[in-house]
């Protein structure tokens, strides 16, 4: 088992890691939040993986393989977990925190494909094809991230029927999420985009550990949607008035997930 700080793993990449732009659009900037307290020691790797539904379905010898070859990293907001156009050396999961998958151009302007909250795993498509990663993976908030090496992933795919079944469902659900994200970004107004971005983070098929509450600030949500914190606040206030969610400090409680997922769909 290996436990490291996120910045210590720069040697995995052919060029130094750099903090990623945290906003997709110039108007998304906001005053920095208070820094979080220093993280405590991480639990054993077996405890972290034991909370993953796919891991619990594996045979004991396959679980042992994962634990022997995988590792965990503690990452801070702004850390680049994986670079675009670097080899897809790992299948990546979020034990705790929030990541975003995005592309940035040379001027720093970007496009976010998806947010990945606690319990989410991603990158299986590129890992299966052993291709270069197609997007940057950036921590939006302090995150505990799990890494399964590409060779371990393929060994499981070749020998574990439960794992193969999980990956098939994962690919299917991820494709649906990306199609919906493109549709929403091009055809919905801002309020509906905020609602749909939130609803995606509560998708139990992809993110089973989210639960009814999500620890996220309005600034962090703005990084996912690509609009300013002030505009996010307006949209959230409207959704709260409709009874779809309840707001607290750096937390969103979903009261009616169906209503949240339906919001703005009449625009299509």
For every predicted segment, state its role.
Residues 18-77, 126-127:
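Cyclic nucleotide-binding regulatory module and flanking cytosolic helices
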Residues 1-14:
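Positively charged, low-complexity/disordered segments
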Residues 140, 158-226:
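Polybasic "coupling" helices that flank or enter modular domains
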Residues 62, 68, 113-176:
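Cyclic-nucleotide recognition modules
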Residues 91, 115, 147, 215, ...:
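Short aromatic/basic micro-patch
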Residues 54, 79-141:
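Cyclic nucleotide-binding regulatory domains
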Residues 201-268:
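Phosphate-/nucleic-acid-contacting segments
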